[in-house]
Amino acid sequence: MSKSYIDKYAEALSKLGTLPPDAPQGVLDIGSNSVRLVGYSGSARTPLPIYNERAFCRLGESVSASGKIEGAQRDLAFETFRRFRAIAEQLGIRELAAFATAAVRDADNSAEFVTEAEKLLGHKIRVLSGEEEAIYSADGVMLGIPEADGLVADLGGGSLELAEVRNNEVRHWVSLPLGVLALEEAGNGDLARIGQLVEKALAKVAWLSRVNEKTLYIVGGTWRALAKLHMEATGYPLEVLHQYECDAYEMQRYCRLISTKQTDLVSVASNRRDALPTAALVLEILMQAMQPTAITVSANAVREGVLYAELKNKYRRLDPLLLACEEMAERMCKSASYGHELAVWTDALYKHAKPEAFSSDELNRLRHAGCLISDLAWDNHPSFRAQVIAQTVLTAPFVGISHEGRIFLARALSFRHEVNEVKHGLNGMRLSQADDRLARAFGLSLRLAHSLSASLPGVLPHTRLKAGREKLTLTISKEQQALNGPIIDKRLRVAAEAMGIEAVLKFGRLDER
């Protein structure tokens, strides 16, 4: 008998032994525009942000004006370091990965600034080269989007990093002095001049043609602000920036509106608003140079890349979505092991399915993830469980999942609690008709399983669910026959109707999967 998807994943995980410890980790990012502290918990492969604070110190402005980090910008940075040291100690972070990028790298008094900053922080600060920054940024994208294939572009205040990623590797990389603050200084605020500088610099990147007609992964706070603005302008229903995807032509058109100041930016935070026209122009010219098929936003960047770089290859290969769901199940479900039984129980559910937005492997992966967290709303009022579980899935800091995947899981897990989708609170978020049917059928099968087993392990292995072309068959062993009742008959029938096939209930010997 061939191994199921779940069996293969469990086998791969067992061979790795214990994951790296999940003591709180901290990263301090000293950028050209802001200084940010992020504290993480969870496993090293799926770091969960537990604290995130930034201060807009604008060190790059000081460097552009005088060549040094001095004055009010320096004083604010040092005040921030004192506070962040106290916060890191409060969080229990023993090792703080502190690094600095373009502004500190380019400052005439870089060594002096770093020495004083290290005294205030109590930790060493690593000044990254431009090339290291590009590699770490690409690593951060791959931590959250393992299948990334294309160009990673990270726009900061002092520089623009580009890296080609493919097959979970960084192939080529370069750092260019095309950060927003640097460009505004070099071009004296003239967007036409700034555009010429960007075009000239990109023309020298010989390997850029290798990523033509691939995905462009955009990184950096100003580009994220631009993407958020685009989501608002188009009425996009899911307010999650990570893995937000946009048609390249549509984004290029929108960038033109921003760079020519033909659209309202009032909803953008004031500390980002002035930089948006320049950032939009850089993105527009970059898209002209590489002709991407799509734009994907990554919430992960250099900070996460620093953590990812410390992982051994065997841990990098672990699925970040499934690991995150396992950790969530341990925190929020009645039984963490029940989800694995449920994943095996539903293994034959999609044997004849033909998803439209997902490959068969991706559908199985989403099914596994859904099984792991299908009980996370158990302690909420029954009237609100469908809404709670849907909103949790839609907004959880998951990585390694597309927006279509989030919506699929949210709809499926809502049906696990409530047949009437009006009560799901999904605000019209839908998939294609075929994939929506799959989500409904999956959710109603989970509803059947939880009724059969009381959401606890030990029962499902004595039953079998099998979906054929014409019948959905539930077999219950004779030892567990007492578990049958009207609610099981009803929920089996409803699940079968969702698949468009007949419900069959049997008792006795279990067939092989």
Where in this protein do the model-derived segments appear?
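Helical "lid/coupling" subdomains associated with nucleotide-phosphate turnover
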Residues: 3-5, 25, 39-42, 62-93, ...
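Short coil-to-beta-strand
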Residues: 47-57, 171-176, 315
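N-terminal basic/disordered segments at the start of proteins
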Residues: 19-48
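Non-catalytic pre-domain segments flanking phosphatase-related domains
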Residues: 1-24
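Dinucleotide-binding Rossmann-like beta1-alpha1 core, especially the glycine-rich loop
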Residues: 98
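A short acidic Gly-Thr/Ser loop motif
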Residues: 28-34, 153-159, 219-222, 299-301
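A short amphipathic beta-strand at an alpha->beta junction
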Residues: 293, 499-513
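C-terminal structured domains
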Residues: 491-494, 498-501
